[in-house]
């Protein structure tokens, strides 16, 4: 089995925090208090890897899974996704970052100066509550400064070292403008079935030209130490925390979740076929009333331990374990690259548990999917 150095990182989580604000209990209470459900989680999740997350009830496992998929908007930290490239998606935050290079660098310099000032101040103080408060404030500013720096340098790379970045800004904006149009054409081609092959080919040529211009500009500074240093930070992954709602929705095909509670996660007004097929229609994999879709949905149902003839039944007509299988079938129907399974097999019979576990293993080997599973230690040992 290959070690982690040989495998590709699919998700890189750095200092992830998910805090929920508490209601203020006093009229003149100044300080906002929080429930720190997740506080400073850092880990790499690799392609084809099965990650088991074990912990007692209420420790924040479900919150972590939902935050990874941005169902909850994370409070702090970075969640980088490498299943698609920055060029493939061309998210709007890239343009915002490029247009604000100068102001971004200025903000970083101000934060660095503030952190240095606080550090010098608390180092002179004797041990006291005030000193530790100043130290904590300094550390928070340093973290914020580092995050601002990464947000900028991961996109522009070595151009961070230049005093005049106008040419680089223009070329980067040109590249991502073309990439965004190309991404839209590919989506229309898939979703609407419109033949856009000619336009796609033209935009690919434009994108190659834009990338060539950028490489030519980078080559001018290949012997510059500062440029090389900052260029090493350049990252073509997608920062999930900075995506807009619509952009994140586009990635739902890649990332799915099997919810812990089958009762509240299924729409009672939809049949099983409609529930499983909803994502397939939303992502343009099938057209409405397509006979092939019904055949595919029935195939997925059978794999998940549901009889195909149940396709027209509603959730209330099923037992708890069967409802859980509907949720599993809905998630796996899209053949995602990453699945968060929130105690997905805990409500199932032993025979069905092993069937679903084997199905998840097959998904991992066939699709290089990464599966994050929240289990009891006993269930974890079985996988």
Residue ranges of model-derived segments:
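Hydrophobic anchor residue at the start of the ABC signature
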Residues: 328, 356
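Conserved ABC transporter NBD signature motif
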Residues: 77-88, 178, 185, 219, ...
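Conserved ABC ATPase "signature" region
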Residues: 291-309
């Amino acid at each position: 089995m290959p070690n982690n150095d040989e495998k590709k990182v699919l998700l890189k989580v750095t200092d992830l925090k998910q805090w929920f604000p508490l209601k203020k209990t006093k009229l003149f209470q100044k300080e906002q208090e929080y429930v720190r459900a997740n506080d400073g989680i850092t880990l790499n999740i690799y392609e084809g890897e099965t990650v088991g997350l074990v912990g007692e009830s209420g420790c924040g496992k479900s919150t972590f899974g939902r935050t990874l998929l941005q169902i909850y908007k994370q409070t702090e930290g970075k969640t980088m996704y490498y299943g698609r490239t920055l060029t493939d998606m061309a998210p709007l935050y890239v343009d915002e970052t490029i247009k604000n290079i100068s102001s971004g660098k200025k903000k970083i310099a101000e934060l660095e100066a503030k952190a240095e000032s606080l550090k010098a101040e608390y180092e002179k103080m004797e041990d006291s509550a005030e000193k530790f408060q100043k130290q904590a404030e300094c550390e928070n500013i340093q973290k914020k400064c580092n995050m601002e720096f990464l947000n900028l340098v991961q996109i522009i790379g070595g151009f961070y070292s230049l005093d005049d970045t106008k040419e680089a800004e223009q070329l980067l904006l040109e590249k991502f403008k073309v990439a965004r149009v190309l991404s839209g054409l590919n989506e229309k081609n898939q979703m609407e079935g419109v033949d856009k092959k000619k336009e796609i080919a033209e935009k690919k040529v434009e994108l190659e030209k834009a990338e060539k211009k950028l490489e030519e500009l980078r080559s001018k500074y290949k012997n510059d130490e500062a440029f090389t240093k900052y260029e090493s930070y350049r990252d073509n992954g997608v920062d999930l925390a900075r995506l807009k709602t619509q952009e994140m929705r586009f990635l739902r095909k890649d990332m799915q979740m099997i919810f812990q509670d089958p009762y509240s996660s299924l729409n009672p007004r939809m049949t099983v076929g409609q529930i499983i097929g909803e994502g397939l229609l939303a992502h343009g994999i099938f057209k409405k009333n397509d006979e092939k879709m019904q055949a595919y949905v029935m195939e997925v149902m059978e794999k998940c331990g549901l009889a195909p003839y149940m396709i027209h039944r509603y959730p209330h007509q099923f037992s708890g374990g069967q409802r859980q299988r509907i949720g599993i079938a809905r998630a796996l129907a899209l053949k995602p690259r990453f699945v968060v399974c929130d105690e997905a097999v805990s409500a199932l019979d032993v025979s069905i548990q092993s069937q679903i576990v084997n199905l998840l293993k097959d998904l991992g080997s066939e699709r290089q999917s990464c599966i994050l599973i929240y289990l009891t230690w006993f269930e974890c040992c079985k996988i």
